[in-house]
Amino acid sequence: GCEIDGDYSEVKVDYAAQGQTILMNNYRQYIDPKYSVRQILVEHRHFNDPAKKENLKKLLLRCPAQGAIPIINYNDPLSSEEIDKVELQELAKSRKDVVHCMDNDETASQIACLVKCKTLLIYTSTLGIYSDPADEKTLIRNITGKDSYELINAVCDAQSKCIGSSRVGANGAVAKLEYIKEPLKNGSEVFIANPRFSISEVIGGQAPCTKIFISK
């Protein structure tokens, strides 16, 4: 198509809409043809509104039986940052567990909670979580606890090592560890890894990464 000119915010929305078709085409190209591919665009409303949340849950839970792989993204083309901000502020007046859904890691964690998934894999630009964010040799391979309470404490300890570091992206690590707390409480195993390693390599233990789980 042609290059789009005009108001920056509108151009960004227009390109986001075009990008969805490119993204889905890429997934269709690389996913085994025996599986169907489904695009699911979400906003904070799909997690904060009980009826919408239940509909999303049912849609996702039907996918495995129907041989479908859901590709979930934020609905950028139809979302408004200003409107979302106002809506979220209103929700925060009456409840504490408001989902913002402004970050892919937060969205992934909310999906994991919704369907109570066994495994949650979050890709990042690093190999995982470091005890010293300035030194990649300090990769934390396992964060464990005998129960969810002990595990969350271990995650908080890992977060404290990220705060105040000079390494670019360390604050992103803090956010990732915060978002995964709820899935961990639900019993999910979480992997934080680098996308140069395949899903099977990460989950199979053949890739350097951080695995977070309740020890048995």
Identify the meaning behind each predicted range.
Residues 1-216:
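C-terminal catalytic "cap/lid" subdomain
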